[in-house]
Regions:
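Catalytic phosphate/metal-binding cores of nucleic-acid and nucleotide-processing enzymes, i.e., regions
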Residues: 1-104
């Protein structure tokens, strides 16, 4: 599965930097998850020069904003399983909705 498509890159470019926006206006462009375990990466921004995302990371009940790399997502493998992109994710979902638990 391709984790980063041209369409997703275009959506990141349209949104731009989100630092000054309220959570209700920050669009979560892509959602990545590991099939076993509880880690979810909600990507808000993407820096193509660094192949790095900025987003909201949920891991074992600890939620934080931070950076994560595309390479990190592509190469993590446990028992033959890899990180996947949620193909049904709606990129108009806001960070506020994710934090409230309205969208998972």
């Amino acid at each position: 599965m391709k984790l980063l498509t041209n369409k997703i890159i275009e959506d990141f470019e349209k949104q731009g930097l989100t630092g000054e926006l309220p959570d209700s206006e920050k669009k979560v462009i892509a959602k990545y998850f590991f099939p076993i375990g509880s880690t979810i990466w909600y990507a808000l921004e993407y820096n193509p020069k660094e192949n790095e995302f900025f987003g909201y990371i949920v891991k074992s009940g600890h939620n934080e904003l931070g950076y994560f790399e595309l390479e990190e997502l592509e190469y993590v493998t446990i028992d033959g399983l890899r990180v996947e992109r949620d193909l049904d994710w709606e990129s108009n979902t806001t960070l506020e909705e994710v934090k409230r638990g309205d969208k998972e």
